[in-house]
């Protein structure tokens, strides 16, 4: 899914559209679909489209905002993704790692407003960290700072989507949570989500969190396990 918003120079949210259906894939068709969704959203805005000065695309994985290259998704062209999208959309386009963008948003207007040094942990389907040092977002030499989830931390033989085995993300992320839930259910444990698993319905993190709010013992135990794994590595 996609979330799209428009903000002004003060950081005020002018308009938004949340939970837009989108199938994320490393294909030209998926990229064209992304551009189409953005163009459709722009047409619905009450403001003059000429006032749009920049479109910033936040995506997961390895992103170098300075060069405009994405190395994890939409990386099939031998030129910057920002340049490709600029041609498709007709606006200036920049790209940024999604976790770093969240970090900066929290820094400007969120719970850490006013702090100078921040570590922001984003646990979603994957796992990432955003870093602010002396009030400035830290990207690292190559623009990849914060790829915490791909530190090899376990001898578990679980293949990560990055191609390596044993990444922290394989034991402490949303995808790890869903995988472990399905494994334990297959071994005979019961959850409020068991029927959905057997029917092969896709599960989301929201489903698991909703189950914990209904005192689902297995989901509570899994979230505690994920939290312990994550906490140990952040502290270490």
Can you name each region flagged by the protein language model?
Residues 8, 65, 132:
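Short, acidic, Ser/Thr-enriched surface-loop or helix-capping motifs
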Residues 97-99, 143, 225:
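Short beta->alpha linker loops
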Residues 1-51, 89, 155-159, 164-236:
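ATP-binding/phosphotransfer module of carbohydrate and carboxylate kinases, centering on a glycine-rich
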Residues 114-172:
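Glycine-rich phosphate-binding loop of actin/hexokinase-like ATP-binding domains
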């Amino acid at each position: 899914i996609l979330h799209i918003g428009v903000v002004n120079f003060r950081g005020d949210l002018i308009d938004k559209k949340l939970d837009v259906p989108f199938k994320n894939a490393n294909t030209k068709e998926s990229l064209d679909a992304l551009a189409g969704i953005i163009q459709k959203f722009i047409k619905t805005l009450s403001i003059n489209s000429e006032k749009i000065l920049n479109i910033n695309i936040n995506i997961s994985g390895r992103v170098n905002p300075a060069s405009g290259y994405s190395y994890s998704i939409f990386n099939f062209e031998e030129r910057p993704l920002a340049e490709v999208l600029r041609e498709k959309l007709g606006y200036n386009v920049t790209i940024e790692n999604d976790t770093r963008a969240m970090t900066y948003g929290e820094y400007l207007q969120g719970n850490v407003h006013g702090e100078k040094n921040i570590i922001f942990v984003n646990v979603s389907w994957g796992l990432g960290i955003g870093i602010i040092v002396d009030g400035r977002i830290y990207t690292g030499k190559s623009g990849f700072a914060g790829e915490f989830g791909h530190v090899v931390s376990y001898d578990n033989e679980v293949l990560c989507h990055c191609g390596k085995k044993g990444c922290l993300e394989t034991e402490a992320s949303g995808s790890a949570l869903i995988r472990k839930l399905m494994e334990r259910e297959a071994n005979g444990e019961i959850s409020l989500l068991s029927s959905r698993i057997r029917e092969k319905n896709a599960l989301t993190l929201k489903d698991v969190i909703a189950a914990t709010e209904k005192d689902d013992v297995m989901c509570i135990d899994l979230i505690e396990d994920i939290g312990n794994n994550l906490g140990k590595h952040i502290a270490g």
